[in-house]
Regions:
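Enzyme catalytic cores with a strong preference for nitrogen-chemistry domains
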Residues: 1-347, 365-374, 401, 406
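ATP/NTP-dependent adenylation/nucleotidyl-transfer catalytic domains that generate, transfer
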Residues: 7, 161-163, 220, 232, ...
Length: 641
């Protein structure tokens, strides 16, 4: 439960129809095993104490009493288990029979939630035996305990207030307006569904989509435990299809006929963060009763997959689709700005590196979209002290293959003159030596744009903006920054995608060589013709910084939790021991706070994903905010050795 992680399981034990004693033993055995694995929330199927396929036997008092006897046995067994447990049973109350979910923890029966929607079509005829649940919550006596009974019940963990449980039963999810919708608006972050959904052709896909979509709509975790082996096969077959989803993502699944156990960790903090930032999610808890319970805090071992590249889809087909969409968004943003400004040219400083390559590719797409010749793109290369033959050659080949206008301005003499003006000793390779070149390049681009009636296209990416890896009023400044919403890890894939669809072998080869070139600003003199200044040696690996950036901005997680996630995401990577992850996380926070002043005056640029740093849009932060709290939390992280 540390960091908001809740280990949860959806379980479908084998059972015998109407044999409550046998079924109870199976449930208790699986519950104990789950507790041994650290599970804190265990959900069993609808009518798991009796079996769903009892038919008119549900009307027999013997079966009803057998279910209550089984419930008492589970309550007794649960006293020594630190697990919130949900089981399904028929319950006679108010003189009517209800299809109920019993919620229990440590021997206490927390509540009984009746099913709202009773299917009475096709193979289902629940209205023959059962009555729909009422929204009115009242207290009844069950197993010698006074228990709240009704559909408007929520269950909150005292030790982890972000874990609030809501309950629905099978058909409730399949209805037009599921009870879980109201549960979520009332504060439930985790919805459980006790189900007995029979298997038919195509139903598993539909069921999976329902669970994923409902978890996305409600910004919640969703556990679905369905009846499996042992149910009567007189007219139906039950496959034990168990699912756990979180905000639209399927985290765990027991496929039909695969054994009936789905288990993973839900991130309740993440769900809270999603709801906090979504102002359309309006809380409404009218009529609800919340029951509190206690669990012993535990540090769950993470088994859920943590994506080391959260900005980049893992599936090749989906990644290609995402790349094409982003390129179209960038191009459309630039096309609109060129049109609005009546710009005759799009002026881009070309270095032979990744970012300027992507900006050039986007500018070419924009001109084609506007029906204008690609020669209206003016690429300017500005070699100086650190420029290598490799990057210079790649810049020229790229421009030639894309059929854009190309010019070279050697800025060495201008920089020499500038250094003489300000008294800079050229043997001192300090920040003035580096930034002076960047600012001269920006001067050349701005004036070239004025001369040609054009617009300067910025090349800096989201990762550089987060780290402040840009010269203030140098490459930091442009008239429209097309890459401002694109993180470095994604820049690589966008360029690779363009290489994959390249019209000529020459274009593909130069793009691949650019991808293979170390990331560098080339502001220090080259050594033996090779790049002497490699960005990732100085500020750290971009795949780490993009990972940190995602969780800092997207969910507002603290350093300790992000460090924990990074350890899980990069486990097995020898180049990333804990000390390295910690070093660059600390570096990220220090730079992120210290460099906000650059982000406070960014040029316009298109948002392409959920994370962006525009001071006019998604990220508003004072330039003089202190990082002390975040750095202090980092100091508390224990490191081995």
């Amino acid at each position: 439960m540390k960091d908001g992680f809740l280990k949860a399981a959806a379980l479908s034990p084998a059972l015998r129809v109407a044999d409550c004693t046998y079924n109870t033993a199976q449930i208790i055995q699986q519950l104990r095993e789950a507790a041994g694995r650290g599970v804190k929330l265990a959900v069993f199927p609808e009518f798991c104490l009796t079996g769903y396929t009892c038919g008119d036997l549900f009307l027999q008092r013997t079966l009803q009493q057998g279910a209550l006897t089984g419930l008492q046995a589970i309550l007794d067994a649960s006293r020594e288990l630190d697990v919130v447990t949900l089981v399904g049973l028929p319950l006679l109350a108010r003189g009517k029979l209800y299809n109920c979910a019993a919620v229990l923890c440590r021997g206490q029966l927390l509540g009984l939630v009746p099913k709202t929607y009773l299917p009475n079509y096709g193979e289902f005829y629940e209205k023959r035996q059962f009555t729909p649940g009422s929204t009115e919550v009242e207290t009844i006596t069950v197993c010698g305990q006074q228990v709240p009974f009704g559909t408007l019940l929520l269950f909150r963990c005292r030790e982890m207030p972000s874990f609030v449980l809501g309950v629905e039963i099978c058909e409730d999810l399949w209805s037009a307006l599921p009870p879980s919708t109201f549960h979520a608006l009332a504060g439930a972050t985790v919805i459980v569904n006790l189900s007995a959904s029979d298997e038919t052709v195509g139903k598993a896909e539909y069921r999976r989509a329902l669970v994923e979509n409902q978890s996305a709509r409600l910004l919640c975790g969703y556990l679905y435990a369905s009846a499996g082996h042992g149910e009567s096969t007189q007219d139906m077959v039950f496959a034990g299809h168990d699912l756990i989803a979180e905000n639209g993502t399927l985290l765990a699944e027991a496929a039909p006929f695969a054994g009936g156990r789905a288990e993973t960790e839900l991130d309740c903090q993440r769900l809270e963060a999603e709801r906090a930032r979504n102002t359309s999610f309006e809380p409404s808890a009218d009529g609800y009763v919340t029951v509190e319970f206690s669990l012993t805090p535990a540090d769950a071992v993470l088994t859920r997959w943590v994506d080391p590249t959260p900005f980049v889809p893992g599936d090749p087909k989906r990644r290609a689709e995402r790349c094409e969409l982003i390129l179209k968004m960038q191009a459309d943003g630039l096309a609109k700005r060129l049109e609005h400004a009546h710009a005759k040219t799009a002026v881009i400083g070309i270095s032979g590196g990744l970012d300027s390559c992507l900006a050039l590719l986007v500018a070419v797409r924009a001109m084609k979209q506007l029906g204008r010749p690609t020669t209206d793109v003016l690429a300017v290369t500005m070699p100086c002290f650190g420029t290598t033959k490799r990057t210079r050659s790649n810049a020229e080949i790229l421009c030639d293959e894309l059929h854009v206008s190309f010019t070279e301005i050697d800025i060495a003499n201008t920089v020499h003159s500038h250094f003489a003006d300000i008294g800079q000793d050229e043997s001192v390779l300090d920040v003035t030596f580096e930034n002076g070149q960047a600012r001269v390049r920006t001067l050349e681009l701005m004036d070239t744009a004025n001369r040609t009636g054009g617009l300067v296209v910025g090349t800096g990416d989201l990762s550089e903006l987060a780290l402040g890896w840009a010269t203030y009023n140098g490459d930091h400044m442009s008239m429209y920054g097309v890459n401002a919403g694109v993180p470095k890890t994604l820049v690589r894939h966008l360029v690779r995608y363009e290489a994959d669809i390249a019209a000529t072998a020459e274009l593909k080869n130069v793009l691949l060589d650019i991808l293979d070139t170390p990331v560098s600003p080339e502001l220090l003199p080259a050594k033996d013709g090779e790049i002497a200044q490699k960005t990732e040696d100085l500020v750290g690996p971009y795949e780490l910084h993009d990972f940190y950036l995602y969780y800092v901005l997207r969910f507002g997680f603290g350093p300790a939790k992000i460090f924990r996630l990074a350890k899980a995401a990069f486990a097995g990577r020898a180049e990333y021991p804990d000390e390295v992850l910690y070093k660059w996380l600390r570096n990220f926070y220090w730079r992120f706070f210290a460099q906000q002043f650059k982000r406070s005056c960014l040029p316009d640029g298109p948002k392409v994903g959920s994370v962006t740093l525009s001071p006019r849009g998604d990220w508003r932060m004072p330039s003089d905010a202190a990082a002390a709290l975040w750095l202090a939390e980092l100091e508390q992280i224990p490191l081995k050795g």
